[in-house]
């Protein structure tokens, strides 16, 4: 039997192909370029490739008419929602690469209130030798040699490639492959912190083990759905479910599939990895995971729920109700007791997953549009917040180790007012205070949910937002209205690109709170999934 050659729509796949090509080029650069050239080459490849891919997304989006097109024998759906999410992932990637590249652990006191980064290549906050045992002679030798872990950039681009395919997947097998491609590099990058190596490696191990379990659940769910419907394509599953009378096997498959997706977004009760991983991973990687991974994972969840599961609407909606309520409640209540800023932001991200699920549960175009807007607003605020947390270093400045202990942040805003004001802006956005992007995004998802009859869910969300305001304001009060102590940390001086990226995050957070209509209109136009 002669199999026909598949028709590959290279134009529609251009953004994804560009990112994967950059990742492959980065691997080749690691293999063949001299060590002294690798850092500059990798940063240029990552930033340039992400920018070119973003341009490709815009070009493809301008050529899309109607609901979109299927590519590669229906395995990939290129529609407005996919391109919107891919563009968001690429914007986050550009900022994340800047924070990774310009980050340095070697600091020297220049003024009483500032630590200036030494004029050395970046990546000094990442271990020089990932395979070395912490504290071993091999690690010390790598440090003396000035080694840098430039493999970080191709790993990040491979993960970005998976993130771009994940929300575009139109069949479950492609979705599983994309899930693994985006996850495996993240497992490695979580364990690359120079300081607190054991904590970082513990975080990577926990993430890997729990991620492997969730992937197994996902794959088993795929098998059950295939057995129940005879197809792996999302439209095919929808049509088969609509024609069936016995949904027991399909429901079991959907439940197992949901475990994998809800683990990746960090919903309760699949959130246990988030606090440890966010605290132990290098802070630029934490910001990258907290923003980009959520965008990709929610894109995949939206596609499964809106394209494949309309016939099971009455079955999955009550389950997501319960998960959203648990996620908002557990995330908010647990964050109140945190004394480490990174762990507080981790539990805060869990609560935000519940808010975003509120938009998903609406199951209408308004809910889809509100969810897309929320993901954009949350991504910029999250990247900015973690970028600033990564600049706060211990009072003695030794090795440039971060100090995320909230009790040490007393008076930090008085010592470094610009940093304090910017972080306060991001925290107020997380709390949903008016004139910030967080207020508009929460209002959008709550309004969509209320219009779909989920008023009790909205009430829980509003109460959770009110409680969450406490621990955000607590950080602001500590920075500006508490006297300095001897443990008050210093703020490292970021590079020019990092300053620009943080400024962009701040401006976007404010502009989306004051004049959100252009992005809301863009999200409305993007709220079309290929069915």
Swiss-Prot record:
Membrane topology, from the record: Multi-pass membrane protein
Catalytic reaction equation(s): a quinone + NADH + 5 H(+)(in) = a quinol + NAD(+) + 4 H(+)(out)
Molecular-function GO term, any one: quinone binding
Transmembrane segments: 8-28, 41-61, 81-101, 146-166, 172-192, 208-228, 250-270, 282-302, 318-338, 350-370, 372-392, 418-438, 453-473, 500-520
Class in the EC hierarchy, top level: translocase
Places the protein is found: Cell membrane
The protein's Enzyme Commission number: 7.1.1.-
GO biological process assignments: ATP synthesis coupled electron transport
GO terms for cellular component: extracellular region; plasma membrane
Family: Belongs to the complex I subunit 2 family.
Oligomer status and interactors: NDH-1 is composed of 14 different subunits. Subunits NuoA, H, J, K, L, M, N constitute the membrane sector of the complex.
HAMAP family attached to this UniProt entry: NDH1_NuoN_1
Protein name per the record: NADH-quinone oxidoreductase subunit N
Organism: Mycobacterium tuberculosis (strain ATCC 25618 / H37Rv)
Lineage: Bacteria, Bacillati, Actinomycetota, Actinomycetes, Mycobacteriales
């Amino acid at each position: 039997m002669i199999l026909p050659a598949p028709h590959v729509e290279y134009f529609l796949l251009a953004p994804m192909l560009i990112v994967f090509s950059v990742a492959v080029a980065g691997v080749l650069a690691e293999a063949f370029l001299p060590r002294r050239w690798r850092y500059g080459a990798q940063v240029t490849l990552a930033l340039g490739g992400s920018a070119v891919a973003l341009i490709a997304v815009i070009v493809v989006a301008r050529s899309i008419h109607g609901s979109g097109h299927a590519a590669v024998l229906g395995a990939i759906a290129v529609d407005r929602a996919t391109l919107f999410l891919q563009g968001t992932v690429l914007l986050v990637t550009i900022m994340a690469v800047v924070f990774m590249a310009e980050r340095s652990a070697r600091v020297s006191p220049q003024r009483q209130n500032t630590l200036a980064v030494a004029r050395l290549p970046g990546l000094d906050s990442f271990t020089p030798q990932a395979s070395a045992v912490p504290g071993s002679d091999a690690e010390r030798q790598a440090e003396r040699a000035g080694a840098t872990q430039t493999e970080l950039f191709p790993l990040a681009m491979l993960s970005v490639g998976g993130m771009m395919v994940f929300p575009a997947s139109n069949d479950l097998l492609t979705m599983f492959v994309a899930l693994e491609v985006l996850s495996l590099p993240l497992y490695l990058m979580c364990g690359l912190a120079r300081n607190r190596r054991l904590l970082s490696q513990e975080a990577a191990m926990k993430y890997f083990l729990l991620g492997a379990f969730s992937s197994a659940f996902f794959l088993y769910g795929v098998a059950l759905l295939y057995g129940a419907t005879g197809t792996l394509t999302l439209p095919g599953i929808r049509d088969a479910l609509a024609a069936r009378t016995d949904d027991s096997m399909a429901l079991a498959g959907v439940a197992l599939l949901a475990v994998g997706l809800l683990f990746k977004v960090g919903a309760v009760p699949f959130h246990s990895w988030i606090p440890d991983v966010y605290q132990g991973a290098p802070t630029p990687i934490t910001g990258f995971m907290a923003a980009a991974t959520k965008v990709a994972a929610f894109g995949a969840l939206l596609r499964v729920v809106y394209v494949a599961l309309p016939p099971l609407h009455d079955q999955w909606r009550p389950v997501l109700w319960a998960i959203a309520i648990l996620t908002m409640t557990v995330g908010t209540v647990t964050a109140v007791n945190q004394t480490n800023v990174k762990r507080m932001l981790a539990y805060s991200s869990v609560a935000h997953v519940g808010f975003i699920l509120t938009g998903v549960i609406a199951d209408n175009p308004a809910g889809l549009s509100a969810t897309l807007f929320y993901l954009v607003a949350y991504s910029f605020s999250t990247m900015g917040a973690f970028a600033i947390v990564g600049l706060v270093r211990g009072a003695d400045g030794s090795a440039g180790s971060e100090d995320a202990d909230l009790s040490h942040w007393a008076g930090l805003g008085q010592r470094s007012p610009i940093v304090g004001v910017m972080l306060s802006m991001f925290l107020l956005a997380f709390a949903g205070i008016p004139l910030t992007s967080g207020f508009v995004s929460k209002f959008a998802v709550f309004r969509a949910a209320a219009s779909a009859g989920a008023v009790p869910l909205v009430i829980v969300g509003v109460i959770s937002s009110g409680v969450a305001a406490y621990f955000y304001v607590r950080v602001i009060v500590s920075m500006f209205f508490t006297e300095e102590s001897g443990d008050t940390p210093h703020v490292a001086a970021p590079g020019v690109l990092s300053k620009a990226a943080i400024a962009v995050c701040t401006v976007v957070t404010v502009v989306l709170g004051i004049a959100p209509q252009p992005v809301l209109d863009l999200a409305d136009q993007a709220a079309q999934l290929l069915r």
